[in-house]
Amino acid sequence: MDLPLLAYKPTTQNHRVASFGIADQNEDTPYIYRLEDAASYSEIREVIWACYRQVFSEHATLAFNRQITLESQLVNRVITVRDFIRGLAKSERFYNTVVAVNDNYRLVDVCLRRFLGRSAYNEEEKIAWSIKIGTLGFYGFVDALLDSEEYTNAFGDFTVPYQRKRMEGRPFNLVTPRYGFEYRDKVGTTKTDWRFTLEKFYDRKFQERRLPEGDPRKYRDLAAAIAPKTRYAQQLRAADIDYLAKVPRRR
């Protein structure tokens, strides 16, 4: 049964402001890729790579993420950019690397950032969309996002989604890795995956875990490494002592 999306109140975000004037044209303004502006094959390839970067949040397009059939259809203008984004989001690779390793609440936040170019307004919106995932499944959730009025007004059929009105803070691709905290701690990728080497220093959870200077807990490992020499009481019974052998004798 398709339940209607629960009502939630939008909060103030930069993308809801029509213009910031000259501040819109700073170095943080992303380049907007449009299929209408692609007149050559190389320019169409740039649009395709931009779609991969936006959906998979990877700086380098990996070979096993590519969807050759969808690429061919987009190059020949058989499908739109919106359809290409939809195909990438519904691909098996995206499901295995993003959907399967996150709970519904974090999945909503990740998809809002990558498909609508904004973060979730509040917890109410996350709950509303997570219910949509529970009733329609993830593919139905993707259709609901890409067919929404917000997506149509912001990007239409031929514009690659991008982070809208980023005036400060870090790009979404750095704050929404495909693993969540729970999954990273569970499988132990936090210490071995290179993507989190720098990321962990900005995580609130990691900052709270860092101990201040002078905290005795910082020297716990040092104290455990010290192996003091211990002296134990002599374990010898009186019945085991040969007293006669110890009596001095004149020779």
Curated annotation (Swiss-Prot):
Organism taxonomic ancestry: Bacteria, Bacillati, Cyanobacteriota, Cyanophyceae, Acaryochloridales
Localisation per UniProt entry: Cellular thylakoid membrane
Function: Rod-core linker protein required for attachment of phycocyanin to allophycocyanin in cores of phycobilisomes.
This protein's GO CC annotations: phycobilisome; plasma membrane-derived thylakoid membrane
Pfam families associated with the record: PBS_linker_poly
Gene: cpcG4
Domain PBS-linker: 11-191
Gene3D superfamilies: Phycobilisome linker domain (1.10.3130.20)
Quaternary assembly: The phycobilisome is a hemidiscoidal structure that is composed of two distinct substructures: a core complex and a number of rods radiating from the core.
Protein name as catalogued: Phycobilisome rod-core linker polypeptide CpcG4
Gene Ontology biological-process entries: photosynthesis
PANTHER family registered for this protein in UniProt: PHYCOBILISOME 32.1 KDA LINKER POLYPEPTIDE, PHYCOCYANIN-ASSOCIATED, ROD 2-RELATED
Record membrane topology: Peripheral membrane protein
Disulfide bond entries: none
Family classification: Belongs to the phycobilisome linker protein family.
